[in-house]
Amino acid sequence: MFEHYLSLLIKAVFVENMALAFFLGMCTFLALSKKMEAAIGLGIAVVVVLSVTVPVNNAIYNGLLREGALSWAGLPNVDLSFLGLLTYIGVIAAIVQILEMVLDKFFPALYNALGVFLPLITVNCAIMGASLFMVERDYTFGESLVYGFGAGLGWALAIIALAGIREKLKYSDVPEGLRGLGITFITVGLMSLGFMSFSGISL
């Protein structure tokens, strides 16, 4: 059992990295990877949000939405899975709002550094994608807990690595036409190629 969860965690972080394998959450990934401090803050926020929303959405899906989930209420044939997207967005929005209030109260500097991108986590496709992958792969509650943490950790690892590279690029002689997003896209592409080396690993 432990080996299964460990392989699921490694797979979520490296083999199926949200940012570098599926290219999810690219908006905030590119916008907030200019400074290491902001990248670390957003990475931690994404880890927290995914670690909470994926298992919560798993419990809601298996307890209320999937076909036959309401058998306990005498409604064995009811299928509410069409409400999945709406429900997941609601859960994500609530968790992000709570996180925003906590950061505003206890970490105002980080809250100001993240700015508008913190509430944008609500519509970050990496956050939504993790919940949709969880449903598609029919994870148990325990698996969804590990997968949510791993997916967030993988995304955080990618943005922190990119931030480190971009800080070094400030002192490099980058051709004028590639400065800014141009060299950043090339860097992300090379990072993705690096992470492709994990794709042949069977876990």
UniProtKB/Swiss-Prot annotation:
The lineage of its organism: Bacteria, Pseudomonadati, Pseudomonadota, Gammaproteobacteria, Oceanospirillales. The chain crosses the membrane at residues 12-32, 36-56, 82-102, 115-135, 145-165, 181-201. It comes from the Bacteria. One of its GO terms (molecular function) is oxidoreductase activity, acting on NAD(P)H, quinone or similar compound as acceptor. Composed of six subunits; NqrA, NqrB, NqrC, NqrD, NqrE and NqrF. One of its GO terms (cellular component) is Gram-negative-bacterium-type cell wall. It is found in: Cell inner membrane. It catalyses: a ubiquinone + n Na(+)(in) + NADH + H(+) = a ubiquinol + n Na(+)(out) + NAD(+). InterPro entries: NqrDE/RnfAE, NqrDE/RnfAE_oxidrdctase, NqrE. It is a multi-pass membrane protein. Keywords: Cell inner membrane, Cell membrane, Ion transport, Membrane, NAD, Sodium, Sodium transport, Translocase, Transmembrane, Transmembrane helix, Transport, Ubiquinone. NQR complex catalyzes the reduction of ubiquinone-1 to ubiquinol by two successive reactions, coupled with the transport of Na(+) ions from the cytoplasm to the periplasm. NqrA to NqrE are probably involved in the second step, the conversion of ubisemiquinone to ubiquinol. GO terms for biological process: respiratory electron transport chain; sodium ion transport. Coiled coil: none annotated. The gene is nqrE. Belongs to the NqrDE/RnfAE family. Its EC number is 7.2.1.1. Its main location: membrane. It comes from Hahella chejuensis (strain KCTC 2396). Pfam families: Rnf-Nqr. This is Na(+)-translocating NADH-quinone reductase subunit E.
